[in-house]
């Protein structure tokens, strides 16, 4: 039985670092995977282009959140701040832009792809934007049965209890991350904890196991 997977990231690069190996494993198993990225710095930004290339490499559908979509449609707005005379590059504060509209957008994607597995940042991630992404996703996915949190750049407060063996898919992860050496070391460390060679790790927000299912 194939599954529909939704992975949510605050910014380009988050999903690649946090769970690209697992997404590759899902695709290898025949699951459909949608990568939803909530923010970016415009269509011409290198991070945006890398995210698009990563989605192609992982054979996943990439969807931009409302803020990211607006920035990609109107790249000239990247240099215009929200205050009079302020022309610095500025991403809106999470509280400004990731409100009910963002929650509704996430819920629309979730419903549209009929996702039954959701990956998102940890709600206590040190980065405020990632915490906001987690909060918005948890609100949108309040009726979902399987929600897993992946680690951010700092795993100091991240205590995983669920591991995915990505040994067969590590090369695909390394092809899309900015620091392959760090990604390899992290996957090896997590693999040692999981008693496999390479792994990614997650903290379940909620995980209902369908024992009667084929997977």
Language-model regions, residue ranges each:
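Active-site rim/loop-helix segments in enzyme catalytic domains that contact anionic ligands
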Residues: 1-114, 142, 203, 211
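A general structural signal for well-ordered alpha-helical segments in protein cores
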Residues: 48-51, 103, 133-134, 170, ...
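Flexible, active-site-proximal loop/turn residues at the rims of small-molecule/cofactor binding pockets
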Residues: 21, 42, 124, 153, ...
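The feature marks non-catalytic terminal segments
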Residues: 58, 75-83, 144-215
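Short, surface-exposed loop/turn motifs that are enriched in glycine and acidic residues
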Residues: 95-96, 123-127, 163
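Active-site adenylate/phosphate-handling loop in enzymes that bind or generate adenylated species
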Residues: 105-154
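Short glycine-/acidic-enriched loop or helix-start segments at secondary-structure transitions
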Residues: 17-18, 45, 128-130, 159
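Short, glycine/charged-enriched secondary-structure capping and boundary segments
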Residues: 21-23, 48-50, 132-135, 161-164
């Amino acid at each position: 039985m194939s599954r529909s997977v939704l992975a949510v990231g605050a910014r380009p690069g988050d999903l690649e670092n946090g769970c690209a190996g697992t997404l590759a494993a899902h695709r290898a198993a025949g699951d459909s995977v949608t990568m939803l990225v909530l923010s970016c710095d415009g269509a011409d930004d290198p991070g945006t282009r890398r995210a698009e290339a990563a989605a192609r490499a992982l054979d996943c559908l990439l969807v931009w959140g409302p803020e990211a979509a607006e920035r990609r449609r109107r790249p000239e707005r990247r240099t215009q701040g929200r205050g009079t005379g302020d022309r610095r590059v500025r991403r809106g504060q999470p509280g400004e832009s990731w409100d009910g509209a963002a929650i509704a957008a996430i819920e629309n994607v979730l419903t549209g792809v009929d996702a039954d597995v959701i990956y998102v940042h940890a709600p206590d991630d040190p980065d405020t934007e990632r915490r906001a992404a987690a909060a918005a996703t948890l609100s949108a996915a309040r009726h979902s049965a399987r929600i897993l949190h992946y680690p951010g750049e700092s795993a100091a407060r991240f205590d995983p209890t669920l591991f995915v063996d990505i040994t067969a898919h590590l090369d695909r992860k390394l092809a899309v991350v900015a620091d392959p050496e760090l990604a390899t070391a992290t996957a090896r460390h997590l693999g040692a904890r999981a008693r496999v060679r390479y792994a990614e790790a997650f903290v379940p927000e909620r995980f209902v196991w369908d024992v009667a299912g084929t997977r």
